[in-house]
Amino acid sequence: MGEFLELDGSYGEGGGQIVRTALFLSTLLQVPVRIYNIRAKREKPGLKRQHLNIVKLLKRFAKAKVKGDELGSIELEYKPQKLKPGYYEVNFDTAGSIPLFLQTILPLSLFVPGEVVIKVIGGTDVPKSPTIDWVRFVFLHYIYKVPEFIRLEVLKRGFYPAGGGIVQLSVRNKLEKQPENLQEVKEYLKDKVNLYRTERGEIRKIHVFSVAHEELRERKVAERQAKGAIEALKNLGYPEPEVYRQYANANSIGTSITIWLEDTKGNVLGADNLGKKGKLAEVVGAEAVKKLHEDWSSGATVDRHLADHLIPLMALVGGEIRVPQFTGHLLTNIWVCEQFLGKIFEVDEKEKIVRTQGIS
């Protein structure tokens, strides 16, 4: 293999997902990685600020030695050391996506010996990304049993274009040292993460979380987004949801809505949407319901965002999920994991199932 595991960043859909997953696995497994042709198929190839923000933290969090960490760079060499507990702060200086940043950093925080607090300043609810509430109420559901303590707090909302949102992740683990090998990783996660999820139950609860900038309070935008979602859910035959409405001060005016359902088998699926100028608040809510309904009515046990988030964890601990659809994103994510761990995934496109025993 040489000093670095070589990854072609143009493989498959060739996007930033390759970078995010590779940095997670490289850091956890202590495998240096060289990614070339980064985002080569995109209109603006190379590393984006959101990827550099992850690297910026990992240079401290994992004492990583890095080459090529520049805006637009099509090659990155990354050599991590062990994760260090402590307090870290990262300021994006843009409305870059905090949820996509956390796709790498949040799972890594589960393997830090002791306590880690990470404060991030950027975008909490921005385009081409899940909302921060989706991370809090959907993704966290699958991993919260791993640490002794975990809290993900939204201290301030950050909408596009100004950003300035503040999120703080606090984690305390019962670990004296970072797992040394694949078997220790699997053993640590074994009884805390259950990703064998092909069975569905009845819908137990539905939640609607509607957020709008404080300046939109008079126009009752948070209420109207929620109303659009409630009516759409009712028209599709879903149970009445629990509704949360919030007005927030932020550097830019914006809105978001996140909807998630829980079933009796312990599955949680979510969807979200952002408001924009000229779009009725009621439509924003209804569109979020449409996304959730598309995923749930497909027979899936995970939503479209969740599949990407769970694949790297499945590679470590094993799992079986039913996805809404096979996307280039999903298949590329599987490919990245298999570059580190060998051929471990099985894909059943007819049944829309992804399964793996994980590392052996």
From Swiss-Prot:
Q: Name one Pfam family in it.
A: RTC
SUPFAM superfamilies the UniProt entry points to: EPT/RTPC-like, RNA 3'-terminal phosphate cyclase, RPTC, insert domain
Residue pairs linked by disulfide bridges in the UniProt entry: none
Q: Which Gene3D superfamilies match?
A: RNA 3'-terminal phosphate cyclase domain, RNA 3'-terminal phosphate cyclase, insert domain
Q: What is its main location?
A: cytoplasm
Catalyzed reactions per annotation:
a 3'-end 3'-phospho-ribonucleotide-RNA + ATP = a 3'-end 2',3'-cyclophospho-ribonucleotide-RNA + AMP + diphosphate
Q: What is its EC number?
A: 6.5.1.4
Gene Ontology molecular function terms on file? ATP binding; RNA-3'-phosphate cyclase activity
Give the GO terms filed under biological process for this record: RNA processing
Where does the record place it? Cytoplasm
Broad EC category? ligase
Mind telling me which InterPro entries this protein's record contains?
Answer: RNA3'-term_phos_cycl_insert, RNA3'_phos_cyclase_dom, RNA3'_phos_cyclase_dom_sf, RNA3'_term_phos_cyc, RNA3'_term_phos_cyc_type_1, RNA3'_term_phos_cycl-like_CS, RNA3'P_cycl/enolpyr_Trfase_a/b, RPTC_insert
Listed A to Z, the keywords are: ATP-binding, Cytoplasm, Ligase, Nucleotide-binding
- Please give the family membership noted in the entry: Belongs to the RNA 3'-terminal cyclase family. Type 1 subfamily.
Any idea what this protein is called? Answer: RNA 3'-terminal phosphate cyclase
Q: What is the lineage of its organism?
A: Bacteria, Pseudomonadati, Aquificota, Aquificia, Aquificales
